[in-house]
Amino acid sequence: SDYLQLAR
């Protein structure tokens, strides 16, 4: 769970 993944 990365904050970069939810930004995709």
Swiss-Prot record:
Modification Arginine amide, positions: 8
GO cellular component, one term: extracellular region
UniProtKB keywords: Amidation, Neuropeptide, Secreted
Subcellular localization: Secreted
Keyword Ribonucleoprotein: no
A Gene Ontology biological process term: neuropeptide signaling pathway
Signal peptide residue numbers: none
Top-level division of the source organism's lineage: Eukaryota
Role according to the record: FMRFamides and FMRFamide-like peptides are neuropeptides.
Family named by the database record: Belongs to the FARP (FMRF amide related peptide) family.
Descriptive protein name: Extended FMRFamide-2
